[in-house]
Amino acid sequence: KPPASHHLMAALGWLELGNADEALAELERIEPELQSEPAAQAARLECLMAGKQWDEAAPLAELLCEQCPEEVHFYLHFAYAARRRTGGSLKQAYKILAPMQEIFPDEWLISYNLACYLCQMNRLDEADEMLAEARKMSGEKVEQLAADDEDLASLRARAD
């Protein structure tokens, strides 16, 4: 039987090919006692996010935030999935991510996502400030993302 690392790499390969279902199937082949390892759980989360399975992704992301509090991307995933899961909301996503600004002050994606949430909640002045913060940290990346991001449409319309 191939080692867990083989299945993990195969799952990541399927994900790169855009096939979240095959990636999840590959992860199921990992020995049950190793499936709870953070690396396997993180790969599972990536699959769930790619497959837009928000109801499953949100609690897994929350668990990974607790297990690996130093990993900023788990908080970003948790907020993103919490917004989109059944019964989820922008407010929930905002409440998850806002405190992370202090913990990860150099992470521009936190400011960017908060700007999106604020904009969607029609808190445009705050969204503008948050986007400016993200721009200070990342500049061109933020400009490219913000130009097409539907979440920021009302902020762009206001600027025109």
Where are these regions (language model features)?
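Alpha-helical segment of the N-proximal tetratricopeptide repeat
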Residues: P2-E33, A43
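"A position-specific structural signal for the A-helix of alpha-solenoid helical repeats
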Residues: S5, M9, A43, H77-A79, ...
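Residue-level detector of the short coil/turn that links helix A to helix B
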Residues: G18, K52, T86-G88, N122
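Alpha-helical junction/boundary sensor with strong preference for TPR arrays
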Residues: L34, C68, F104, M137-S138
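Alpha-helical adaptor scaffolds
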Residues: A39-A50, P59-L109, C116
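TPR/TPR-like alpha-solenoid helical repeat scaffolds
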Residues: L45-A50, A79-R85, K141-A159
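TPR/TPR-like (Sel1-like) alpha-helical repeat modules
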Residues: Q67, C119, L124-K141
